[in-house]
Amino acid sequence: MKWSEISIHTTEEAVEAVSHILHEAGASGVAIEDPAELTKEREQQYGEIYALNPDEYPAEGVLIKAYFPQTDSLHETIAGVKSSIDVLPSYDIEIGTGNITVNEVNEEDWATAWKKYYHPVQISDTFTIVPTWEEYTPSSPDEKIIELDPGMAFGTGTHPTTTMCIRALEKTVQPGDAIIDVGTGSGVLSIAAAKLGASSVQAYDLDPVAVESAEMNVRLNKTDDIVSVGQNSLLEGIEGPVDLIVANLLAEIILLFPEDAARVVKSGGLFITSGIIAAKEKVISEALEQAGFTIEEVLRMEDWVAIIARNA
């Protein structure tokens, strides 16, 4: 079968939004080529943890590649993707050039091509994320492994926002905590929470593909006795109280439910948010404070922030 590779040149800020647009348009796979991956802060902290070829990355910006079967409606699909991307600046998301190019590829070329971007990565003092197809031996008895098979629909769990969320969980999760993961995606944050000692984790996502991916990864990590995965829109209809809520979502989505988070998390409980570009830190912090939260700590990595807030 012939497939079309749609390449979009954009910014790091727009990666999550553009990836979501491509998934919604029916992409059968998405790969992200971000030159920031070549010089991650974690390389300096943890040594040479992966080897990437600089020639495969753009000189500037981020290249997002998505794969669609060649059909009569492909041109309409691409036009729809372009229209959705062109709207992002109205949400204060900088898209860069937004240039779109199309190339024809064979199925065998793209079906495994995305795996070359995914290697074992130590993202904190505690956790290393390992793809299921690679052998990896922990360097110490205290090192915790999260095995992920993200398929071609979700990221590798090594984006700065995910890394910061996991580091925030390391700081805050207590044995026996009840936790909710809003917008779970691959399920990586729920798995981390379970491995940190949470007694129950509710993982929710609106996307049925995400629910399926998270369920698979939860089973893969043998945390299905702690983590339950379900389809839901944010915190609609969810009752508390829980000790902690974590949400790694776009800032615009986080702004939709601070009040619900304050309702569901117990008094004195925590709300960890990320997916927040640095320019949006103030508006998110203000929304959290208006809902009754107190900002306890802000984590920063590259152009992203994660916020740890405590409920009144």
Swiss-Prot record:
Annotated compartments: Cytoplasm
InterPro entries referenced in this protein's UniProt entry, alphabetically: Ribosomal_L11_MeTrfase_PrmA, Ribosomal_PrmA_MeTrfase, SAM-dependent_MTases_sf
GO terms of biological process kind: methylation
One Gene Ontology term, aspect cellular component: cytoplasm
Pfam family name, one: PrmA
GO MF assignments: protein-lysine N-methyltransferase activity
EC number: 2.1.1.-
Role noted for this protein: Methylates ribosomal protein L11.
Family named by the database record: Belongs to the methyltransferase superfamily. PrmA family.
Name the UniProt record assigns to this protein: Ribosomal protein L11 methyltransferase
Organism of this sequence: Bacillus cereus (strain G9842)
Chain's gene name: prmA
